[in-house]
From Swiss-Prot:
Residues 11-193 form the tr-type G domain. This is Elongation factor 4. Required for accurate and efficient protein synthesis under certain stress conditions. May act as a fidelity factor of the translation reaction, by catalyzing a one-codon backward translocation of tRNAs on improperly translocated ribosomes. Back-translocation proceeds from a post-translocation (POST) complex to a pre-translocation (PRE) complex, thus giving elongation factor G a second chance to translocate the tRNAs correctly. Binds to ribosomes in a GTP-dependent manner. It catalyses: GTP + H2O = GDP + phosphate + H(+). GO terms for cellular component: plasma membrane. GO terms for molecular function: GTP binding; GTPase activity; ribosome binding; translation elongation factor activity. Its EC number is 3.6.5.n1. It is found in: Cell membrane. It is a peripheral membrane protein. The lineage of its organism: Bacteria, Bacillati, Bacillota, Bacilli, Lactobacillales. It comes from Lacticaseibacillus paracasei (strain ATCC 334 / BCRC 17002 / CCUG 31169 / CIP 107868 / KCTC 3260 / NRRL B-441) (Lactobacillus paracasei). It holds the Pfam family GTP_EFTU.
Length: 612
């Protein structure tokens, strides 16, 4: 392809993303776009084509961003190259959205005609506005009887400030409005800027590990071009590799001779060491490097921490390898080795939220065939020591002695809860119960309210989302952002089994709720810890003070079965012998803590844990 043809190709490239709140139908709309551009043969078509992870299909949600190249012949007779990047809608995966948008010039804002603008719609739109993208509003699901497109148009204008007079009315199910969407992408989304002859600058927005090809880099080329045989250099560490293959996803991998300005594709270069690459790095050519790297991504900070341990300790290295490979594909995951007396060697992992944690555990167990135990989640706590020093901990087991602590601070979030008017009461009640502090309440229209609360993050990560959905019949939507740390009256609660503290079961709780939480944990453990030959006392303690206790009764063999009548002293002797044996067994016996015990604490029910 000569210079002129390349410049003409650049003019015909359109890069766009689809952003929406969870369940507003963006993956279905993406299916219709793939169908209409003949990217996928009718016989290969299936629901949510771009959600190619088994886990995504099962849960019906998008977890990973996905890039795909389409070819569309517009009404003006010219063929355009579209790069569509499908994004997740859940608050835990907003980092995936921000990375997708950095690779685009435009975005389709999809809003459900029956639900209207929701919390995550707003959060994602602001990301797109920050990146200065051209936004095309699409009102989806207009074929439903309960659709209110005019009301939704008003909401888009009032809440987001976008002109929605020419918003496209569409249905991902029937395909209505999809041809109009494609035409608007051609006319409204600008072609990528960038100099074809400048030194190569390509932004790594995702990566994945392939057993045969090594690390596969997903890139958006911002300047210059790259082809097979070129020697590339990673600008963060100066490492050099020879390109073995370049191509695009359509939606399966299609090899190409080169990638140029505006292209969204992949590069393989026999990169075998996972640590050499990171998302947000810039790829350039070794013999003609760019002067400075592209603006990468802000460092993402995990919000929730949990211990991850292999059931079989011999699998520790397998778990490390699996986490390293997964981290390539999930840039928000953080981990470091840790040791637990109860569970052996494992890793302390940082996640963006509870769904992210759940998804990581499931991907590790499925894709890497590991059996794992996950401890109850915790957040970062700032501890001011009596000598004036500061310490940050994310593991209750690391909590210093009470005598050394001056104050403990915990992270707070500003939670924005959008809810129909009828459910404001239950939402406020739930937020107050979770130690929330009311900030303000805005009436969005006649039907819906945006309630804003300051809440401790530790209260949100357990079951706040589940409780919110059940108390509002599924109508509420939630978005939150960290606002800082505040001093709180927190204590460390230890769980003792057979008199020994189990470090993996320790939790940090608010003093006011310690008794109820301790009582509930002890009751839950009693039902999940299997009975032994000796009885097991389960205790919840703060310092040396036991605040709750229960006992798992022992199995007993009937030692009197062979005694038919006879002297009572004979029976007493047998019973005393059994008692002595049980006592000896108890002093040396160790208690196995099953995975269900950890999970039962993870999903503590609100009525138990905070004594409604």
């Amino acid at each position: 392809m000569n210079q002129e043809e390349m410049l003409d190709r650049q003019k015909h490239i359109r890069n766009f993303s689809i952003i929406a709140h969870i369940d507003h139908g963006k993956s279905t709309l993406a299916d219709r776009i793939l169908e209409l551009t003949d990217t996928i043969a009718k016989r290969d078509m299936q629901a949510q084509v771009l959600d190619d992870m088994a886990l995504e299909r099962e849960r019906g949600i998008t977890i990973k961003l996905n890039a795909v190249e389409l070819h569309y012949k517009a009404k003006n007779g010219e063929t355009y190259i579209f790069h569509l990047i499908d994004t997740p809608g859940h608050v835990d995966f907003s980092y995936e959205v921000s990375r997708s948008l950095a690779a685009c010039e435009g975005a389709l804002l999809v809003v459900d005609a029956t639900q209207g603008v929701e919390a995550q719609t707003l959060a994602n739109v602001y990301l797109a506005i920050d990146d200065d993208l051209e936004i095309i509003p699409v009102i989806n699901k207009v074929d439903l009887p309960s659709a209110q497109p005019d009301v939704v148009k008003e909401e888009i204008e009032e809440m987001i400030g976008l002109d929605a007079s020419d918003a496209i009315l569409a249905s991902g199910k029937t395909g209505l409005g999809v041809p109009e969407i494609l035409e608007r992408i051609v006319t409204d989304v600008p072609a990528p800027s960038g100099d074809l002859n400048a030194p190569l600058q390509a932004l790594i927005f995702d990566s994945v590990y392939d057993d045969y090809r090594g690390v596969v880099l997903d890139v958006r080329v911002k300047e210059g071009q790259v082809k097979v045989g070129d020697t590339i250099q990673l600008m963060s560490n100066g490492k050099q590799f020879q390109v073995t293959e370049v191509g695009v996803m359509s939606p399966k991998a299609v090899k190409r001779d080169f990638l140029m300005v505006g292209d969204v594709g992949y590069i393989t270069a026999a990169i075998k060491t996972i640590q050499d690459t990171r998302v947000g790095d810039t790829v350039t050519l070794a013999d003609r490097p760019a002067e400075k790297p592209l603006k990468g991504y802000r460092k993402i900070t995990p919000m929730v921490y949990s211990g991850l341990f292999p059931v079989d300790n011999a699998k520790f290295n397998d778990l490390r390898e699996a986490l390293e490979k997964l981290q390539l594909n999930d840039a928000a995951l953080e981990f470091e080795p840790e040791t637990s007396q109860a569970l052996g060697f494992g890793f302390r992992c940082g996640f963006l939220g509870l769904l992210h944690m759940d998804v990581v555990q499931e991907r590790l167990e499925r894709d890497y065939d590991l059996d794992l135990i996950m401890t109850a989640p915790s957040v970062d706590y700032e501890i001011i020591m009596t000598d004036g020093t500061e310490k940050t901990i994310d593991n209750p087991a690391d909590m210093p002695e009470v005598s050394e602590i001056k104050e403990i601070r915990e992270p707070y979030v500003k939670a924005s809860i959008m809810v129909p008017n009828d459910y404001v009461g239950p939402v406020m009640e739930l937020s107050q119960r979770k130690r929330g502090e009311f900030v303000t309440m805005d009436y969005l229209d006649k039907y819906r309210v945006n309630v804003i609360y300051n809440l401790p993050l530790s209260e949100i990560i357990y079951d706040f989302f589940d409780d919110l959905k059940s108390s509002t019949k599924g109508y509420a939507s939630l978005d939150y952002e960290i606002t800082g740390y505040r001093q709180s009256d927190l204590v460390k609660m230890d769980i003792l089994l057979n008199g020994d503290p189990v470090d993996a079961l320790s939790t940090i709780v608010h003093k006011d709720f310690a008794y109820e939480r301790g009582k509930a944990i002890v009751a839950r453990l009693k039902t999940t810890i299997p009975r032994q030959q000796f009885e097991i006392p389960i205790q919840a303690a703060i310092g040396n003070k036991v605040i709750a206790r229960s006992t798992v009764k022992a199995y007993r063999k009937n030692v009197l079965a062979k005694c038919y009548g006879g002297d009572i002293t004979r029976k007493r002797k047998l019973l005393e012998k059994q008692k002595a044996g049980k006592k000896r067994m108890k002093s040396v016996g160790s208690v196995e803590v099953p995975q269900e015990a950890f999970m039962s604490i993870l999903k503590m029910n609100d009525e138990e844990s905070q004594g409604k």
